[in-house]
A protein has these predicted regions:
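Nucleotide-activated chemistry modules centered on ATP-dependent adenylation/adenylyltransferase
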Residues: 1-206
Length: 207
């Protein structure tokens, strides 16, 4: 059985983005830098080998979107600009218009294009209806999430048994740089996973 583990360098670990690797894919995947720390090892080895980029500054953004314009990239790929739509307050009233729901993310506070007497945040993005939902800070708090697109990268009979027996205690995160959050993983009759956190979490977003 092939397993996906976290890299030695926690600041550069990519396992969060590789969750969907199946056994078939893992069997053909090699991570040559997994056991190395970038600053202590990788840069030193690169310098010793005469690599010209050994001390090159790092890029923190997606490499194929160097200008950081994610919305523009998606629009170009789709071949048309994002459609405008309604910005909706927590009571259902329309409080503004947006120029593309893809430009908003849950928890966002700045650049909303809506002026109100108190701080407001994006609490939901409804792509199907092309609406952006706003609310207050308290509306961003949740204690659980459901997972539709989940995968066991390494099937484990013991974990399956624990899951069916009442749940598995896990350390989970829903954001790349986030520290592990204590939670319990359970599965309902339809096979959908439910992750219940020990402590309330802020701005849980799909994806």
């Amino acid at each position: 059985t092939w397993q996906l583990h976290r890299g030695e360098d926690s600041k550069k670990d990519q396992s969060y983005f590789l969750y969907s690797l199946t056994q078939e894919r893992l069997a053909h995947t090699i991570f040559p830098l997994a056991g190395l720390d970038k600053e202590r090892n990788v840069r030193r080895i690169a310098a010793e080998q005469g690599f010209t980029n050994a001390q090159k500054a790092e890029s923190e953004d997606i490499c194929f979107i160097p200008d950081g314009d994610y919305a523009g990239y998606i629009e170009r790929r789709c071949g048309h600009p994002a459609a405008p739509g309604d910005i909706v307050w927590r009571d259902g009233s329309v409080v503004g218009r947006h120029n593309g729901a893809l430009r908003y993310t849950i928890g966002q506070r700045k650049g909303l294009g809506v002026a109100m007497a108190h701080p407001v945040y994006v609490t939901g993005v409804d792509a199907a209806n092309n609406t952006v939902h706003l609310g207050e800070a308290e509306d961003l708090t949740a204690t659980a999430l459901t997972a539709d697109d989940w995968i066991w990268s390494a099937p484990d009979a013991r974990m399956e048994a624990e899951l069916d027996a009442g749940g598995i205690r896990v350390g989970a995160k829903y954001r790349y740089r986030q520290k592990d959050q204590a939670a319990t993983l359970t599965r309902d009759e339809d096979g959908q996973m439910l992750l219940t956190f020990d402590e309330p979490q802020r701005a849980i977003a799909p994806g």
